């Protein structure tokens, strides 16, 4: 629950299927991951996907499955993350997390389900 609130607080804007997040230096996950060399943990990146998909669908969502995840660059303190969903024919979504220049931080192929 704490993670959900922290991720929701990072939300800045939405343009169509693109969601803008600013990850501040005081984001709670940076304290322990890793001291002296902070980066946003993969679980937080997946949490951003669920948070954004909830905004898109209008209902609270959680990740049902991740069939592939690729982490290309670390998300550091004070980063801006643009998250976009691309629907796939198999019912899953390609979630791409990029910076303002379009350089990828990570991408996940995932499916969602309504949270209980």
Features from the language model and the residues they span:
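HotDog/MaoC-like acyl-thioester-processing domains
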Residues: 13-15, 86-116
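Hydrophobic beta-strand-centered segment that forms part of the acyl-chain substrate-binding groove
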Residues: 50-89, 103
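A broad structural signal for short, well-ordered beta-strand segments within beta-sheet-rich domains
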Residues: 6-11, 63-66, 105
């Amino acid at each position: 629950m704490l993670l959900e609130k922290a991720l929701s607080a990072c939300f800045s804007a939405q343009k169509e299927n693109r969601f803008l997040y600013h990850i501040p230096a005081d984001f709670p996950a940076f304290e322990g991951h890793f001291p002296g060399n902070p980066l946003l943990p993969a679980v937080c990146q997946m949490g951003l996907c669920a948070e954004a998909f909830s905004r898109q669908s209008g209902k609270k969502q959680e990740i049902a499955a991740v069939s592939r995840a690729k982490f290309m660059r670390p998300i550091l303190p004070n980063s801006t993350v643009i998250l976009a969903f691309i629907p796939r024919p198999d019912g899953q979504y390609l979630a791409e997390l990029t910076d303002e220049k379009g350089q990828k931080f990570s991408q996940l192929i995932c499916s969602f389900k309504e949270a209980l």
